[in-house]
Swiss-Prot record:
Bidirectionally degrades single-stranded DNA into large acid-insoluble oligonucleotides, which are then degraded further into small acid-soluble oligonucleotides. GO terms for biological process: DNA catabolic process. Belongs to the XseB family. Keywords: Cytoplasm, Exonuclease, Hydrolase, Nuclease. This is Exodeoxyribonuclease 7 small subunit. Its EC number is 3.1.11.6. It comes from Nostoc punctiforme (strain ATCC 29133 / PCC 73102). Its main location: cytoplasm.
Length: 75
């Protein structure tokens, strides 16, 4: 199995759906105006990091799918 890049994404228990839910929660709080300006910046930075982790995860899965499709084509 391929390891995920990034410190947070390689930890045990990392979950794509959970990160997407966290990103959605951050967006909701920012849009609702529930946060002070400093917290907005902190939450935005967290959301960007989660998005990077998710993108890396999806890229790795796409590579795995491409490899599987390639092996099917060879058979």
């Amino acid at each position: 199995m391929v390891k995920r890049k990034g410190a947070s994404s390689s930890e045990e228990g990392w979950n794509y759906e959970a990160k997407v839910a966290e990103i959605e929660g951050i967006i909701t709080r920012i849009e609702a105006g529930e946060l002070e300006l400093e917290a907005v910046f902190e939450q935005f930075a967290s959301a960007v990091e989660y998005l990077r982790q998710c993108e890396s995860f999806l890229q790795q899965r796409q590579q795995q799918v491409d490899l599987l499709i390639e092996t099917l084509s060879e058979e």
